[in-house]
From Swiss-Prot:
Homodimer. CODH oxidizes carbon monoxide coupled, via CooF, to the reduction of a hydrogen cation by a hydrogenase (possibly CooH). Inactivated by O(2). Binds 3 [4Fe-4S] clusters per homodimer. This is Carbon monoxide dehydrogenase 1. The gene is cooS1. GO terms for molecular function: 4 iron, 4 sulfur cluster binding; anaerobic carbon-monoxide dehydrogenase activity; hydroxylamine reductase activity; nickel cation binding; peroxidase activity. It is found in: Cytoplasm; Cell membrane. Cluster B is an all-cysteinyl-liganded 4Fe-4S cluster; cluster C is a mixed Ni-Fe-S cluster which is the active site of CO oxidation. Cluster D is also an all-cysteinyl-liganded 4Fe-4S cluster that bridges the two subunits of the CODH dimer. Keywords: 4Fe-4S, Cell membrane, Cytoplasm, Iron, Iron-sulfur, Membrane, Metal-binding, Nickel, Oxidoreductase.
Amino acid sequence: MSNWKNSVDPAVDYLLPIAKKAGIETAWDRYEAMQPQCGFGELGVCCRICWKGPCRIDPFGNGPQRGVCGADAHTIVARNLIRMIAAGAAAHSEHGRHIALTLLEVGEGHAPAYRIKDEQKLRKIAEKLNLAPAGKDIRQVAKEVALASLDDYSRQKRNVPCNWAKETLTAERVDKLAELGVMPHNIDAVITEIMGRTHVGCDADAVNLLLGGIKGALADYTGMCLSTELSDVIFGTPKPVITQANLGVLKEDAVNIAVHGHNPLLSEIICDVALKMNEEAKKAGAKEGINVVGICCTGNEVMMRRGIPLATNYLSQEMAIITGALDAMVVDVQCIMPALTSVAECFHTEIITTMAENKITGATHIEFREDSAVESAKKIVEVAIEAFKKRDKRKVNIPDCKQTAITGFSAEAIMAVLSKLNANDPLKPLIDNIINGNIQGIALFAGCNNPKAIHDNSFITIAKELAKNNVLMLATGCGAGAFAKNGLMTQEATEAYAGESLKAVLTALGKAAGLNGPLPLVLHMGSCVDNSRAVNVAVAIANKLGVDLDKLPLVASAPEFMSEKAVAIGTWAVTLGIPTHIGIVPQIMGSSVVVEFLTEKAKDLLGGYFIVETNPELAAAKLVAVIKERRRGLGI
């Protein structure tokens, strides 16, 4: 790997040599030590589902072509894939359940740390779910919405689809998915069904297995959608906010607390409590008090709603500790590296776990519960202040790297900006500019980071090329983090990289929104669960045009995808009719049936399909070609 550049993030480039000199192992070191990775696993042809195995299929056709039970490569690859989808759906949907249960507690008056911050949105959701909120007390509406959402985890009638899936998609798409038998009726049941059908001696038809995976991906979409919408009700719907990103947001003279993970229930309270405990931090010697920063999707949540600076994204989370300036990293669920505690041992940093089902050996555990949220947050901040007192100033190396980032573009915020140009028909300016070609299409960037690609590079490279081709870009998750850290969520990026017609549209919208300049080149829509915000925008456009989602000049890209959640997201994007690029070779190449289904046959069946391309320049060209193909289909 001598010619391999690990990252385009200057903060990472600054800190990696420091880590190496100190003998601190990072994700990049562990990835290199893992080479060569298992070829059977890379192809998806290793089966560990029963203890007759593990069984490995010879991809060259010379050795075993079936496992001990007789499962062939197609069955093995499909089973492995849809189990990943089930895990991803479980992760997102458990997040959603947590939010829904908290909303129920708010409605019942049992969660004093939380309140309803967006009553208007709550009533709109109630109307969407056919709950007739008019004239009802807001707490009653909260209870009814929460219970209707929780129904999506418990409904036993298989012919009644999940509320949040049925009411948020186009009618044509709902009908198509129902005809295919893949509309979920119950998130938990669908995940259970996947685990059951992939047990030894069950479903052995690759295509049938994949259809089960598609159903699981739609369950994931359901859980994500309700997570986002109900979080907005409790914490407020994001509006444009100017903040900063990258590790330069850490401060030498402050108690630095990073919130990391995915669940805003904890991080929001940490932010509140930190403000109230500023004086305690100053008494401990921190001249600037407490500085809360974000990492990963929890970071995106508080960045969108509060303007809390984003320190970094998934792959570089260890770098926050290696600065020597981080006093506490408070983690909840998902995408938290177990290695954090090992890195923290080299510094004074406290790694604080907070969820009963997510502990890490070597971390300090402070249990978080909604009914005692403030008390838990106070304990956490106190631990951070005590850690600050132990900080070794000789080890502090904060890179001088931070970028301005304009974030907070929820679907509602985008509509509010558009309404400045046409209050009676906010979508008209957007649709008119798509039809006349000023905006060629829309691209959603999502997903993770992966050391198999140069950190952040594919996001940046593809975005610059799409911008040149006048494609409007949205972003979520660690992809959004890449853009924020590398300066693509600024007005200057729009001036530098946008094609002339896209630049003109973004400038008109930015000035109308009072930004005294264009909107940023990439619009930050939130965390990974907030991919559903992009669906809301797409569905609104499709309904306005009278077409289904698979006709829109809309694409998605996850150029550095890594997690099982990303597998689920990509699958539901394809299922909704969105051509979806992935920049990491998926672990399915051992089955021609699975590859053909996901990259070709899905196009005929669903309208969406996967585009596998590891070269970001070629990926950008392919996405532009897809957008042009879709435009021709619409006759524009």
